[in-house]
């Protein structure tokens, strides 16, 4: 990471505060970085805190590919109440005594939601249904269904189970959990589905994103800290840390920059960062039929 006093060119890792939308953070960063060319890789709900990866200037071209990486969360799930939003921001729609739910049944429910699963996203979300945001359809009183889609929950752990009493007097259980998952996973939906499977309902009461791909809380700074001293990860460093690396000689570098599809060495599926003989980050590519297909040029 380097500290900048002029308009930066790279990634900015923010520890998002509760109450801010991801767009709020982008708007704030536009002022701090003195440029409108700012975007983010993966939305965080207003209630949630934690790692939000921003791209500034040329680094915005990395964001769509960074958004596809694995994410890690810490959160609290309340068993015994459903809400319209599947989190604590929404109105409670049902309450059920959860005091009889056992740890064994919780563990079984967690196991059923681990691995490759089909998940229905929360209705109050930014997902588009026939071109219209799902939350806008909910606000308009529309009746609709969101199709399930595949997601991967690599890890779902319960660290603590706490007995509590909700404001309406319902005995509930609060679970302190961690989740490692693929892009596009809704943690709110995990809370909802765990509660539904246990027959008592459930929603998310707290969420903190601790990692996006290789970028964790140790690399994140608050908006106030960035306002005081903006810290930027250069594009080349960001690419090298997030994607497999392919070093090429000068001849191959020129061919790749001109869009020639060269044979690629074996790499895991997904984007690969190409570096020239001088160590400069040149282009992001992916394998297609054994050849390098250009995704974004940075040279």
UniProtKB/Swiss-Prot annotation:
CDD domains: PseudoU_synth_EcTruB (cd02573). The active site is at residue 45. Belongs to the pseudouridine synthase TruB family. Type 1 subfamily. Transmembrane segments: none annotated. Responsible for synthesis of pseudouridine from uracil-55 in the psi GC loop of transfer RNAs. It catalyses: uridine(55) in tRNA = pseudouridine(55) in tRNA. PANTHER family: PSEUDOURIDYLATE SYNTHASE TRUB1, TRNA-PSEUDOURIDINE SYNTHASE. Its EC number is 5.4.99.25. GO terms for biological process: mRNA pseudouridine synthesis; tRNA pseudouridine synthesis. This is tRNA pseudouridine synthase B. Gene3D superfamilies: Pseudouridine synthase, PUA domain. GO terms for molecular function: RNA binding; tRNA pseudouridine(55) synthase activity. HAMAP family: TruB_bact.
